[in-house]
A protein has these predicted regions:
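Extreme N-terminal segment that seeds HTH/winged-HTH DNA-binding domains in transcriptional regulators
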Residues: 1-43
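Flexible loop/hinge segments that line or gate small-molecule binding clefts
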Residues: 146-184, 280-290
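An alpha-beta-alpha
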Residues: 188-227, 318-330
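N-terminal helix-turn-helix
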Residues: 30-67
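Hydrophobic alpha-helical segments within soluble ligand-binding/sensing domains
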Residues: 168-204, 295-315
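Periplasmic-binding protein-like
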Residues: 87-88, 136-145, 202-208, 244-252, ...
Length: 330
């Protein structure tokens, strides 16, 4: 009746809950029928007593079973509504992804249990997490970023249960998604700030190319070509000086700190001697150097939209809104 698997990523107490609910659904367990005793489950599966107690207590809270002191646990209800389980695979945790996650949780409410994982831009870790999650969840919400072979791994999951988040690509068009249009977002953002940019001699994009979406580079080059801006793309900002009268477009917050620190060593004033446009809005960027200009998608909206899509069982692809926030830095 109770089936437990090792190394499948699901806690043992959760597997006990799922097994009992499944037994009730399949009428293996009937109303008022006695469950296996705690001691029996402990001995049969070689697990701790606390693990079994945790599972039985949770089933009591859900109104599925009841206890009679000194006798055991019994089926209280055969009307089982198993809680849905969602697999969330993010690239990394930062302040704006945390905003996304919290917004998603707030909108999804108590509809599901959420298991959050991170692949940290590691292809092997991504593939491993996908493989181990198969068959264990009702929905799979995935940030594939620009990982090689990500599409192949995603396609091994049940197609009807997969949702793509943040970055997508032409190979994933069959899946519903809430995504950033990186080409359009950086192009439109720079175009709206064009009046401020025209007083600078060059735009410089710091683009390492490992984690950054290729769409940023494409949109940047397209904007500079269309509006005749002198421009340059560099892979990193290590051991070089800040060039006066240039605007640095900086996707990475690590590079943002490096540029500001180097400019201070050169005694350059931000917004006067050089400019900065950072990617992704955070509360701190309102305050640093009297305000850093940002181009950013709305991560709270992204989380809310995704949750609403799942609740409505919508299968569309939705482009998340983005905007430029002009501040002192340009």
């Amino acid at each position: 009746m109770i089936t437990l698997k090792n190394n499948n990523g699901i806690p043992k107490y959760t597997q006990i809950i799922q097994s009992i609910e499944k037994a009730i659904e399949q009428k293996v367990l009937q109303l008022n029928e006695k469950l296996p005793s705690i001691n029996k489950v402990v001995l049969t599966h070689n697990i701790s007593r606390d693990t079994v107690l945790q599972a039985y207590d949770e089933l009591k809270k859900r109104g599925v079973i009841y206890a009679i002191l000194g006798k055991g646990y019994y089926v209280k209800s055969t009307e089982i509504k198993p809680k849905k389980r969602f697999f969330l695979l993010f690239d990394e945790l930062n302040i704006f992804k945390e905003d996304l996650y919290n917004s998603f949780l707030k909108t999804i409410g108590s509809e599901a249990e959420i298991d959050l994982y991170f692949h940290h831009f590691n292809t092997n870790q991504f593939k491993k997490l996908i493989q181990e999650s198969k068959g264990n969840y009702n929905k799979y919400i995935i940030m594939p970023t620009n990982l090689i072979e990500a599409t192949e791994s995603i396609k091994t999951l049940p197609h009807k249960d997969v949702f793509i988040l943040d970055q997508t690509n032409p190979d994933l068009l069959q899946f519903p998604a809430v995504y950033q249009n990186f080409v359009k977002d950086i192009y439109d953002g720079l175009a709206k700030g064009k009046q401020h940019l025209q007083r600078y001699s060059k735009l410089i994009l710091i683009f390492p190319g490992f984690r950054e979406p290729i769409g940023l580079k494409i949109g940047f080059e397209r904007f500079c070509h269309d509006f005749n801006f002198n421009h340059e793309i560099i892979a990193d900002f290590t051991d070089i000086n800040v060039i006066q009268n240039c605007v640095y477009i900086i996707p990475s917050d690590r590079d943002l700190v490096q540029v500001i620190e180097q400019a201070k060593r050169q005694k350059l004033q931000l917004g006067v001697d050089y400019g900065i446009i950072s990617y992704n809005e955070t509360p701190l960027k309102k305050l640093v150097e009297n305000g850093i200009t940002t181009i950013s998608t709305d991560f709270e909206t992204m989380g809310k939209t995704l949750a609403e899509m799942i609740l409505k069982n919508s299968k569309t692809q939705i482009e998340n809104p983005s905007r430029i926030i002009i501040r002192n830095s340009i």
